[in-house]
Amino acid sequence: MHRFNPRRSACDRCRGHKLRCIRLDPGPNDTGALLPCKRCVKAGAECIHTANLSVKPPGDGHHSAHRATESPGHPAAFQQETRVSDRQLRESSLGISPTQPAPQRQTQRWSSSSGPHRPEDRESLPPWHMFATPMFSRQQLGFSKLPSHANGPPDDRTADGFEVGSEAALAAPPGSERSPHRTSRAPSDGTTTFSLVDKVFDLDGRAVCPLSGSVLQENAGIVTAAASTTVTSAQTHHMLPFSQVEPLTPSSYFNVPTCSTLTTGGAGSQSLRDQQMQQHQRHGSASGRSSAATQDSCLQLLSQLSSKFLMDFGKSSAGDWSKMANNNTNNHLSTTISNLFDGLQIFLKTIECLRPATFLENSSSDSECSYSDLCDESEFVGSTGDNQMQVYPGAMAVDHAHEGSSTENSAHRRGRGASPTADAAPQPLDMPMTLTILTCYTWLLKGYEVVLSEIYQMLASQDRHQGLQTLPTIVQGVGIGGFKLEDHPDMQIEIVIHVGWQLLQRIEGLLGVRVVSDEGRGGLGGSSRDESSTEGGDGGGAGSSASDERRILDPRAAAAVLDSWFTTTTRGGSGGSGPGEGTGDSNGGRTVEIKGTIANIRKYLRSYGRN
């Protein structure tokens, strides 16, 4: 029968859990070996007994560890085993003669970080030892103790250590500052681990490792990654917060432009002329006319617009709207007005890209200051109030300002005082482009006529004895400054008529056709009109000679196409009930009589005002 060992020989596992260690006595014949305790045997864990260092003065012998090993005589006999670290082996091989045995130095190093120190030990520490990671007990750090080696030597605690590759070696301190209390060492291979890494704080308070200059030069990338990993691991195991080293961002990163599109005020200090120069370089140019790439892109956009206008205005009928309720009619009318104005602006910007290069070149050569002409043109285009209108016109102004490299424009500049001749006249567009432009233009006229017809029918069905306040609101949220137009439906109607009229006049001035701007005099294309005449329509100036110079279509070809589309045997009005007006052909080819519908609308508004 074994007897219980009465002496105090608790193992590390029981001591860490503060439990009573019950160890069997091997008997009177073998007093040097210790059997494993009952708790370790029951748990199947390794029973390790480390000598209590607190009762030994520093420097008196070395600590020993008892490890249970299997032997033929004793199944779980204990043998005394001495541990030697890699650094001690290296120091022995380098000829360093320590004053104490290697295990004793290791014991002193471990006890110096957790136990009391002698005064001479504190004085022998290097200057940066105060910045080293302190090794407190796990109770002080707030962590639970490890069950197997809570009070073991540092070399056994590899779970809390940091692995560093051979490339990220730590720089060793000078020989004069070497001390047995220093814990930093250069690892011997890539798998060597250590539990304590001395860190040096820079002026910003960041924790960095003292890396050697050669390592930084040869393996800068690997060292940075290893140092970041080391500092990050220290955050999770240490009470002091080590901020992770952030990578440096090159200053050129902040100089990258953040906006590539031209919007109102989006280019900062960049002037409108510089924006036009950039657009000209992107799109390219050809001598005497727009480039082929620009024409192809415009043709593709116009084809898409034609399909969109077909869906917006082709299937709309004022007669069908009159059967709907008032609320649905107003919502549909507001949507159609919005689609019409958007279509007019997009179409105007697109055809301005096709404007011939000789217009601004001629006008600028006849004046003393060509820059003023460019400014006036930009203000003319931007007066519509749409921010996106600033994108397309800029390219056209530059196309005309920078086409001077061609032979034709150079010859024209030599004849600065002469008037424009037939040789400098722009070449007309081809037939596919002409037909696509006229198709979109016809759909826009159709949409404008549909809007006016619906407004006319709404006024005709309204009780005029109730006053203007009973008219429904066709445009929501419209105001001029602090003056709200929601309570003034008559002014809203006038705004819709005026804005649509002005946009159509600008489009006709670029195309060289006259349907609404010239009251139909001289034909739809203006071929029989006197070119020197400066008379215009009610919009003013759209039929002037300047408009003839900037047109992009052949007036005769455009007049022939429009005459075949708009002229029918039976003339009819869009909204009308005026004298001499018929029903018109609803199957297509109606003559657009927009002015008659506008006159009828204003007549109804005047009758509301008198009542």
Swiss-Prot record:
Pfam family membership, one: Zn_clus
Keywords carried by this UniProt record: DNA-binding, Metal-binding, Nucleus, Transcription, Transcription regulation, Zinc
Gene name linked to the record: pyiR
Name of the protein this chain belongs to: Pyrichalasin H cluster regulator pyiR
Reported function: Transcription factor that specifically regulates the expression of the gene cluster that mediates the biosynthesis of the mycotoxin pyrichalasin H, a tyrosine-derived cytochalasan that inhibits the growth of rice seedlings, but also inhibits lymphocyte capping and actin polymerization and alters cell morphology. Pyrichalasin H is indicated as the responsible agent for the genus-specific pathogenicity of M.grisea toward crabgrass.
Gly residues bias: start-end ranges: 572-587
Biased composition annotated in UniProt, kind: Polar residues: 265-279
InterPro entries xref list: Zn2-C6_fun-type_DNA-bd_sf, Zn2Cys6_DnaBD
Biased composition (Low complexity): 98-109
Cellular component, GO, one term: nucleus
GO molecular function: DNA binding; DNA-binding transcription factor activity, RNA polymerase II-specific; zinc ion binding
DNA-binding segment(s): 11-47
Species in which this protein is naturally found: Pyricularia grisea
Subcellular location as annotated: Nucleus
SMART domains: GAL4
Basic and acidic residues composition bias: residue spans: 59-69
Region Disordered, annotated ranges: 53-128, 169-192, 265-291, 401-427, 521-550, 564-593
